[in-house]
């Protein structure tokens, strides 16, 4: 699991990081001390669990928690604070737990186990749904070039772009160019992984390497092969939802 600790007190963050490492089972544990750092962390990582303090230097933790819950796939939120008067509000946000400082390892472990149990159940359900969806879509994409039909495995397709009537399909080991329109391929791609980010671009979200802020409040997506594709303004909402961004 991946965890994010949001607290403006360095000692509290350090203590919680230490306890989580003692409990074990975490692939990654990151920290944020304010809203800006939180948003940056959520942009580049999909977390399973967030430990959130109520009193932050630039925003109330309850308000931040409400924003996080609006994500397409929000992480489990555990409020970790010295203030007990916000517990009702926290659970109204469907918080997984509410832990009071000073932290104890046993209490933290109880909260983590709640998240793990819920995640295991959700993963099983998601796997079943994904298998059903995959069954309804071809696993290979037929691409006709020079009287030959190439069968491209969808998991190897990194992104597809079109310019001046030429559609370029980027894969993990080759680049294919065709005059077929982008819309033709969009209908055949598995929507579990592929998303249109621009009228000229479709990407495989499994091949996103990095997302950079760009002009006019948009993003530039850098794919695993180094190709850059800009997110169109009208596609921003769907793109942010697809990568779990606020």
Curated annotation (Swiss-Prot):
Query: Which Pfam families does this one have?
Result: LytTR, Response_reg
Instruction: Mention any one GO cellular component term assigned to this protein in its UniProt record.
Output: protein-DNA complex
Spell out the SMART domains in the cross-references.
Answer: LytTR, REC
What the record says about disrupting the gene is:
Deletion significantly reduces target tissue survival during calcium-daptomycin treatment and increases susceptibility to host defense cationic antimicrobial peptides.
Q: Where in the cell is it found?
A: Cytoplasm
Which cysteines share a disulfide bond? none
Which of the residues bear the PTM 4-aspartylphosphate?
53
Decide whether keyword Transferase is in the record: no
Q: Which Gene3D superfamilies match?
A: 3.40.50.2300, LytTr DNA-binding domain (2.40.50.1020)
The record ties this protein, via InterPro entries, to: CheY-like_superfamily, LytR-like, LytTR_DNA-bd_dom, Sig_transdc_resp-reg_receiver
Q: Where is the HTH LytTR-type domain?
A: 141-245
Respond yes or no to whether keyword Aminoacyl-tRNA synthetase is given for this record.
no
Q: Which UniProt keywords apply?
A: Cytoplasm, DNA-binding, Phosphoprotein, Transcription, Transcription regulation, Two-component regulatory system
Q: Which GO terms describe its biological process?
A: regulation of DNA-templated transcription
After translation, the protein is modified as follows: Phosphorylated and dephosphorylated by LytS.
**Major subcellular site:** cytoplasm
The Response regulatory domain covers which part of the protein?
Answer: 2-116
GO molecular function terms attached to this record: phosphorelay response regulator activity; transcription cis-regulatory region binding
Q: Describe its function.
A: Member of the two-component regulatory system LytR/LytS that regulates genes involved in autolysis, programmed cell death, biofilm formation and cell wall metabolism. Also participates in sensing and responding to host defense cationic antimicrobial peptides (HDPs). Upon phosphorylation by LytS, functions as a transcription regulator by direct binding to promoter regions of target genes including lrgA and lrgB, to positively regulate their expression.
Recorded hits in NCBIfam families, A to Z, give:
PRK14084.1
The record's subunit annotation is: Homodimer; when phosphorylated.
The protein, known as:
Transcriptional regulatory protein LytR
Q: What is the lineage of its organism?
A: Bacteria, Bacillati, Bacillota, Bacilli, Bacillales
Q: Which gene encodes it?
A: lytR
């Amino acid at each position: 699991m991946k965890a994010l600790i949001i607290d403006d007190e360095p000692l509290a963050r350090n203590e919680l990081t230490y306890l989580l490492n003692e409990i074990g089972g975490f692939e990654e544990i990151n920290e944020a001390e304010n809203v800006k750092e939180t948003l940056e962390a959520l942009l580049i990582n999909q977390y399973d669990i967030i430990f959130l303090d109520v009193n932050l230097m630039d925003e109330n933790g309850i308000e931040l928690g409400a924003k996080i819950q609006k994500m397409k796939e929000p992480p489990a939120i555990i409020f970790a604070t010295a203030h007990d008067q916000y517990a009702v509000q926290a659970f109204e946000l469907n918080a997984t737990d509410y832990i009071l400082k000073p932290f104890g390892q046993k209490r933290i472990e109880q909260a983590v186990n709640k998240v793990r149990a819920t995640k295991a159940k959700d993963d099983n359900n998601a796997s079943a749904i994904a298998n059903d969806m995959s069954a309804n879509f071809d696993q290979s994409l037929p691409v006709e070039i020079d009287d030959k039909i190439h069968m491209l495995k969808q998991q190897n397709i990194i992104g597809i772009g079109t310019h001046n009537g030429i559609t370029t399909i980027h894969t993990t080991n080759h680049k294919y160019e065709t005059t077929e329109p982008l819309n033709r391929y969009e209908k055949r791609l598995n929507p579990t992984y592929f998303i249109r980010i621009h009228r000229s671009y479709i990407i495989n979200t499994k091949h996103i390497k990095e997302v950079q802020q760009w002009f006019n409040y948009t993003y530039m997506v850098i794919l695993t092969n180094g190709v850059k594709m800009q997110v169109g303004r009208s596609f921003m909402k769907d793109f942010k939802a697809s990568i779990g961004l606020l």
